[in-house]
Design a protein with these regions (language model features):
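Flexible "cap/lid" loop of the alpha/beta hydrolase fold
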Residues: 107-111, 118-148
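Active-site loop/oxyanion-hole signature of alpha/beta-hydrolase fold enzymes
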Residues: 49, 53-97, 248
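Catalytic histidine-centered segment of alpha/beta-hydrolase-like enzymes
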Residues: 234-243, 247
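Hydrophobic, aromatic-rich cap/lid helix
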Residues: 164-194, 208-209
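Gly/Ala-rich beta-loop-alpha elbow adjacent to hydrolase catalytic centers
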Residues: 98, 102, 106
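Conserved HGGG/HGGXW glycine-rich cap/lid loop of the alpha/beta-hydrolase fold
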Residues: 6-64
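Conserved loop-alpha-helix segment in the C-terminal half of the alpha/beta-hydrolase fold
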Residues: 202-234
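Glycine-rich His-Gly loop
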Residues: 27-31, 100, 207
Length: 259
């Protein structure tokens, strides 16, 4: 379907008949090599089977969604999500479940449209603050430099797999040949006051050795209704490596909000 002017790959998984809860979850994937497949292969089917309508889509420039040369600020991603929900007729609040950059998008959407968000589950994510922008600039600059070298793909295949090499090739094409690396850190960024003003319930799921290992409680200490779950011995790839536990956390969380 066309979303905010772009051909967008959207997948709907309706709640299983007989157990419909009336709740809707929107899955927001991460940046780079990620796509809606990461949720389709982990959370989408069991969440729909539990009676929750599930919406997944490839973010602009990712997966099967159209890839413009420019237009990758967080404001662009927020506008895409808002248009998608409007086109689907979803005016009631939804649960946003975001992995990595998808969680960052969820926070920005909740700040811009608080009446449309019932709750947030963020997996290895943080809001788009100045600190986040500095971190993202470093990560993206390093990624561009790494993927610009041919030997990097040999290293990826040797240490992971040929499949990971193909994913890295696609990510390199996206990052090097669009403005995404320059646009994303621009925000618009949220002040700490704006983060504190996000009033919906938030569940932050982190790996103890993940991207927020320097201060695991920094985010939830700002949020008026924030809760934290930490997986010991886990890095950034929480969704893929701990998907069964994440599934139970998400299902329990949504059931609590609906009670």
């Amino acid at each position: 379907m066309t979303v905010n002017g772009l051909q967008t790959n959207v997948q709907l998984a309706p709640a299983r008949a007989g157990v419909r809860t009336g709740e809707t979850a929107v899955f927001l994937h991460g940046m780079g090599t990620d796509s809606l497949a990461s949720f389709y292969l982990t959370l989408a089917p069991p969440v729909a089977a539990a009676g929750i309508d599930v919406i997944s889509y490839d973010l602009r420039g990712h997966g099967k969604t159209e890839r413009p040369d420019s237009g990758y600020t967080i404001a662009d991603f927020v506008a895409d999500l808002h248009d998608l929900l409007n086109q689907l007729g979803l005016t009631q609040p939804v649960h946003l479940v975001g992995n990595s950059f998808g969680g960052t998008l969820a926070f920005s959407y909740a700040a811009a449209h608080p009446d449309r968000v019932r709750s947030i589950v963020c997996i290895e994510s943080e809001p788009a603050t100045e600190m986040w922008a500095d971190k993202m600039t470093q990560i993206l600059d390093h990624t561009v430099d790494f993927l610009a070298r041919e030997e990097s793909f040999d290293w990826i295949e040797a240490n992971f797999s040929a499949h990971h090499r193909r994913l890295a090739r696609m990510a390199a094409d996206r990052i090097i040949n669009t403005s995404i690396a320059q646009d994303v850190p621009l925000g618009p960024l949220l002040s700490l006051g704006e983060v504190e003003g996000i009033g919906c319930p938030v569940l932050s799921i982190l790996g103890r050795e993940g991207y927020q290992s320097d201060d695991l409680e920094a985010l939830t200490s700002l949020l008026p209704r924030g809760e934290l779950h930490v997986f010991d011995g886990q890095g950034h790839s929480v969704l893929v490596e701990r998907h069964r536990e994440v599934r139970e956390l998400v299902l329990t969380w949504i059931a609590r909000q609906a009670a």
